[in-house]
A protein has these predicted regions:
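A short SAM/SAH-binding and catalytic strip from SAM-dependent methyltransferases
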Residues: 223-238
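The AdoMet/dcAdoMet-binding core of the Class I SAM-like
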Residues: 45-219, 226, 241, 283, ...
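A short helix->loop->beta-strand "cap" motif at the edges of active sites that frequently abuts
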Residues: 73-75, 250-255
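Conserved beta-strand signature within the Rossmann-like core of class I S-adenosyl-L-methionine
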Residues: 224-226, 254-261
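Class I SAM-dependent methyltransferase Rossmann-like catalytic core
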Residues: 1-48, 61-69, 88-91
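A short glycine-rich, Lys/Arg-flanked "PGG" loop and its adjoining helix->strand segment in the class I
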Residues: 237-253
């Protein structure tokens, strides 16, 4: 797994550390928990036929969690990620097992141990049939090369992969994959495949390319968009106003975009692109992300006056990528220059003024 280090997150699901970005792919409190809390639980799914655009598919947690939670729907997933390897490894990643021994050992790794927070263990799950569906569609897209046995068989990584699914693919290999499209022949291997999937249409389309190029080629609209790119300072390419405007054009009038970030830049970018924007609040009443839609009714937790004011400071100035082809460095430098030349109030000054207003209000109330 060149460039990636697997580790156990706080809910005992597997996350990845990127050596390129020196950052984690998944929240330290739980990769699977994050997928459910930020990309599944905020959505009220009423339609029976659904189209999902998953930007930065990675290990597939968001789409897998959504499918697992919506078993009786017909769903088409369009999955975008520049890294084909992660796509192909996605069905084999462990999500349902406690790996406490490995959690204790990884504390010695200073690259990612600081991110991991052992929190409340929640029984979110990904059932095996979801991964079997992924295996089927990955094979149909990439052929036999989707099965990266050189990585899956390495001893150092074996604790992070589902051995039963690896063995399942090896069995299919021996049969020349001739049974991979025949659910009735899989019945003796996995009853749940027949039970859940024989009467439904589930489709995964994979686009292993720069998401900026892919979104310009898509000619359909979506009910849900998952925006799960690296943070803005690491991957500004997928947070620019120009990219977000493309997403606005790809989403249905009643569609919903969800993302993990609470960033002032991104919330203002979404608003400038035409979205109504609100907050995602988890069951612990913590703000864990941002929700956006063309339909104001879809927003349950609006931004308050203070948060809206903060968007109008220098902190809210968007990233710009006019051709959707610039490097991260170019985009960051362009925004830096725009911020320096802007006459808008700085966020630090705005926060200070707001704090002083609160202090004055409290003082007046005491009189």
């Amino acid at each position: 797994m060149d460039g990636f280090l697997p580790y156990i997150t706080g809910d005992d699901s597997v996350g990845l550390y990127s050596e390129e970005f020196h950052d984690i792919y998944h929240s330290g409190y739980g990769a699977l928990t994050e997928a459910y809390e930020k990309f599944v639980c905020p959505l009220i799914v009423e339609k029976d036929n659904i189209n999902v655009l998953d930007i930065c598919f990675g290990l597939g947690y968001n789409s897998k969690a959504f499918l697992n939670a919506n078993k009786n729907k017909k769903i088409i997933f369009d999955c975008l990620d520049i890294n084909k390897t992660l796509m192909c490894l996605s069905p084999f990643i462990k999500t349902n097992h406690r790996l406490c021994d490995y959690f204790r050992k990884q504390k010695d790794n200073d690259k990612y141990s600081k991110y991991v927070r052992k929190g409340k263990y929640k029984k979110y799950r990904i059932e095996d049939w979801v991964n079997i569906v992924l295996i089927k569609h990955l094979y149909e897209k990439f052929g036999e090369e989707f099965f990266m046995e050189d990585i899956l068989s390495q001893n150092q990584f074996s604790p992070f992969f589902e051995q039963n699914l690896i063995n399942f693919v090896k069995f299919l290999q021996k049969r020349g994959y001739k049974d991979i499209g025949s659910p009735q022949k899989w019945l003796f291997l996995h009853n749940i495949y027949y039970r859940y999937l024989s009467k439904r249409d589930i489709l995964f389309n994979f686009y292993p390319d720069d998401a900026r190029r892919t979104v310009q080629k898509l000619n359909k609209t979506y009910d849900y968009i998952f925006l799960d790119a690296f943070t803005t300072d690491k991957c500004p390419q997928l947070w620019s106003i120009d990219f977000i405007k493309h997403l606005y054009n790809l989403i249905l009038p009643d569609g919903v975009l969800v993302t993990y970030t609470n960033s002032v830049i991104i919330r203002n970018t979404l608003i400038e692109a035409g979205f109504f924007v609100g907050k995602i609040i988890n069951e612990d009443k913590k703000f864990v992300g941002t929700i956006a839609s063309k339909d104001k009714i879809k927003i349950k937790n609006y931004l308050n006056e203070y948060e809206l004011g903060l968007l109008k400071t220098k902190a809210g100035i968007p990233y710009r990528d006019f051709t959707l082809a610039d490097s991260a460095e170019q985009i960051l430098e362009r925004r830096k220059s725009e911020v320096e030349q802007s006459n808008l109030m700085s966020s630090s000054r705005y926060i200070k003024l707001h704090s002083n207003k609160i202090k004055k209000r409290c003082s007046d109330n005491e009189l």
